[in-house]
A protein has these predicted regions:
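Acidic, polar-rich low-complexity tracts and alpha-helical solenoid repeat scaffolds
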Residues: 1-268
């Protein structure tokens, strides 16, 4: 719960060498497998989970093992094998496995473009749950890829209703507002795009992308002078960023559209 995963894994390994952790059933092994999986050691994690599939183990242990195996298969892109693993999970999983199973199914359905089935699960998730903003973001992205920008923006905007203020949530909020802005832009709703881009923090990780989009939304509305303000601010940032590079090309384009050819030539 403190996100000290390496320390937790180290303590588990030390405890195992000293005879194991008593009184916690199969939980230490499940956690150890999860840590190995998080560090990309899939073969070691898989060996642990497959060992937990023994029929003598409790059902909740086998459910957890199959769930983690399904996750690994999903991450490898083997969707058929993911479904096969999920079929082994009981109809009444317990504890955290319920939420993890639902979240995996949402992502699996999205990958298969079964958006209504994914949405049916997401609609049951409370705004208070930690996973909610990530599920909303994934649903929004899926609708945007299908060019259903209205639904995409609706899910992006759900994130604005959440009161979490951790840095992780604020970054996701910025990412959602930036993506919503581009969804409006692609849907030729330039004024709405501008309003979304304005909600992104100027010192956040998505500010460059938002400044670029803000400018293009103004260009689409033929407000070339207004486009220059965010682009000029962006052009003063690191040149390594592709958004900055695009802004430096976009600035002379805006001058050209304003029939200020000497300025355009100088900027080119």
């Amino acid at each position: 719960y403190q996100d000290q995963h390496f320390l937790a894994l180290s303590d588990l390994l030390v405890a195992e060498e000293q005879g194991g952790i008593k009184g916690h059933g199969d939980n230490p092994e499940i956690m150890m497998g999860g840590f190995y999986m998080a560090y990309g050691l899939e073969r070691t994690a898989s060996d642990i989970f497959e060992r937990l599939l023994d029929s003598n183990r409790p059902q909740k242990t086998r459910d957890a093992a199959w769930l983690y195996l399904a996750k690994m298969r999903y991450l490898r892109g083997d969707l058929a094998a993911t479904h096969e693993a999920l079929e082994h999970i009981s109809e009444t999983p317990v504890g955290a496995a319920v939420e993890e199973l639902e979240s995996l199914k949402v992502n699996l359905f999205i990958k298969e473009n079964r958006l209504e089935e994914a949405r049916a699960i997401v609609e049951k998730v409370s705004l208070r749950e930690d996973r909610a903003p990530y599920l909303y973001f994934n649903m929004a992205g899926a609708y945007a890829r299908n060019q259903n920008y209205e639904q995409a923006v609706a899910f992006y905007n759900r994130i604005t209703q959440m009161r979490q203020r951790s840095e992780a949530h604020l970054s996701l909020y910025d990412k959602a507002m930036t993506a919503a802005g581009f969804a409006h832009l692609y849907n030729q709703q330039n004024d709405l795009a501008v309003q979304q881009f304005k909600q992104v923090r100027l010192d956040g990780p998505y500010s460059n992308r938002a400044l670029l989009g803000f400018g293009w939304a103004q260009v689409e509305g033929e407000n070339y002078q207004a486009a220059l303000t965010p682009w000029q601010a962006l052009s003063k940032r690191t040149l390594i960023d592709e958004n900055t590079q695009e802004a430096m090309v976009a600035i002379p384009y805006a001058y050209e559209q304003m029939d200020l050819k000497p300025a355009a030539l100088q900027k080119y």
